[in-house]
Amino acid sequence: MVFPAKRLCVVPYMEGVRWAFSCGTWLPSPAEWLLAVRSIQPEEKERIGQFVFARDAKAALAGRLMIRKLVAEKLNIPWDHIRLQRTSKGKPILAKDTLNPYPNFNFNISHQGDYTVLAAEPELQVGIDIMKTSFPGRGSIPEFFHIMKRKFTNKEWETIRSFNDEWSQLDMFYRHWALKESFIKAIGVGLGFEMQRLEFDVSPLSMDIGQVYKETRLILDGEEEKEWAFEESKIDQHHFVAVALRKPDGSRHQNVSYQDDSKPSQRQFTILNFNDLIASAIPMTPEDPSFWDCFCFTEEILIRNGSKS
């Protein structure tokens, strides 16, 4: 008797992913904008349409496209078959009934300043945050630090204030902030986490653009958390990115070791352009020209307010 051959399920090989997209320099044409919104789920399009400012709409749309690109290209799931949902805290996740070859597959996005960034791992818990160093909207830097005093420990403030010039102090402030947010996003608790429970011993104090460092240590409630690892990088002169990593079972990610590997890693961010974002896209809804009119309107508000995306 001849039995039919068994159908083989090919599991795609996946490494960690680090992507960045410059929303601030993206000036979409009507065709680009309408194609982009046709390539996301209707509920996400509706959510993006509620943003007042163009910069926020662009950043959120880029994030949705990055997630779909990730799932389509790394998990081999057709673009129009991907279903994204949100947790009770608003974190985007794959729908539970998705045929995913990686049970611990995890991704996270962040957008602030001029970039939207994404980090993904096949087997690791992951959180990402990006912060742009910029002067406070109102008041002096010392006044700003006073308002934010309870967000950092005394030791962290000592590190922040160890620099002579205020801009370098602000730089270190946002670096610490990105680290804390990456951890909070990785554990998925959202607002309400007491940030002074976290203390980061940052190293090195100076970082080169384009390199990735993994020497910074986390102290949680006074105890060093060795199962967590943090990748830090500067995409450009003003943007810090922190990626928090942890195995689901709580053990340390073996490729990230503070003691044994103090040199920059090679997992650098890949800067994507718009064509990269939509390379695998399949439009899922009819074209809606009115959505471009809405975008132009938010652009006008932005210009009247004297800001740029």
UniProtKB/Swiss-Prot annotation:
The UniProt record lists the keyword Metal-binding: yes
Binding annotation for Mg(2+): 129, 181
Subcellular location: Cytoplasm, Cytosol
Keyword Transferase: yes
Swiss-Prot/TrEMBL keywords: Cytoplasm, Magnesium, Metal-binding, Transferase
Binding site for CoA: 47, 86-91, 108-111, 181-185
Highest taxon of the lineage: Eukaryota
Enzyme Commission number(s) from the entry: 2.7.8.7
GO biological process entries: 10-formyltetrahydrofolate catabolic process; lysine biosynthetic process via aminoadipic acid; protein maturation
InterPro entries on file: 4-PPantetheinyl_Trfase_dom (IPR008278), 4-PPantetheinyl_Trfase_dom_sf (IPR037143), AASDHPPT_N (IPR055066), P-Pant_transferase_sf (IPR050559)
GO MF annotations in UniProt: holo-[acyl-carrier-protein] synthase activity; magnesium ion binding
One Pfam family this sequence matches: AASDHPPT_N
Function of the protein: Catalyzes the post-translational modification of target proteins by phosphopantetheine. Can transfer the 4'-phosphopantetheine moiety from coenzyme A, regardless of whether the CoA is presented in the free thiol form or as an acetyl thioester, to a serine residue of a broad range of acceptors including the acyl carrier domain of FASN.
Subunit field text: Monomer.
Family as reported in the entry's similarity comment: Belongs to the P-Pant transferase superfamily. AcpS family.
Protein name: L-aminoadipate-semialdehyde dehydrogenase-phosphopantetheinyl transferase
Organism lineage: Eukaryota, Metazoa, Chordata, Craniata, Vertebrata
Name of the gene: Aasdhppt
